[in-house]
Amino acid sequence: TRKESSAASDVYKRQRKTAAAGVQVPPDLLYAYFRLSGRSRVLKAGSYEIPRGSSPEYLLDMLAEGRQAVRSVTLVEGWTFRQFREALARADHLKQDTTGLSGPEIMTRLDHDGIAPEGRFFPDTYVYPKNSSDLGVLRQALQAMDRRLEAAWSVRAPDLPLQSPEQALILASIVEKETGLQADRGQIAGVFANRLRIGMPLQTDPTVIYGASEAQGVAFEGRLRRIHLDTDTPWNTYTRPGLPPTPIAMPGNAAPVSYTHLRAHETKAN
């Protein structure tokens, strides 16, 4: 059985919690032990889970090293920003500081004002201390995607028909939704790169689906029909040439090589 003890540097004032955790030392003596150890000033505040029967030495090491109770949340490749937010809302012991905020408002809080949130967060498993803010997890994912996008853009092919890292991210998201197979991504990206080069519409179903659903804040239901293909939206790559205005999903780690470092024979695909 584990009991939670918070505010590590205030153990003396939290005698009941320490005793409930099963540390078999009177609180006054425990406090004195911490002071005499010479490490009392390095104890780290936070949320801790203390195993019942812990020794003073174990407890001191735990608090000095900041081994807080942590939880994790997994954000999956190919998810949309809406799905990311739903996963964060379900996460254990994660404060919901973004409740009621729009996507643009969240990006402003994350110091990315004016940037669309779709596609900007790297899918991965994120570990966080209990009772952290969901904004903290989003910031981790945002910074992780920024780093990967910058690295991929720095080694892009010289003749790539893309003008900015943002366009590369948009193309990466389309490739992500087109296939889950890493081996196919280069060929698919090559097809799209060639179409962009000659001004041909990309004609890819995932963008149509996004424009008919996620762009409106809802999940897509049913099957893709002719009416969807014929209905013009900024994301309909059948009715409009070029890239859509935003990514359509969160591309994973394998995507950057596919959309920024195409081999010559791939860019000749049609």
Segments the model singles out, each with a brief description of its role:
Residues T1-A8, Y12, H261-A264, K268-N270:
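Single conserved hydrophobic/aromatic residue that forms the stacking wall/gate
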Residues E86, D92-K95, T108-R263:
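Bacterial extracytoplasmic/cell-wall-associated proteins, especially those involved in peptidoglycan
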Residues E4, E77, E176-E178, E266:
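Acidic-residue sensor for enzyme active/binding pockets
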Residues T1, G38, P158:
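Short, flexible, glycine/charge-rich loop motifs used to bind or transfer phosphoryl groups or to couple energy/partner
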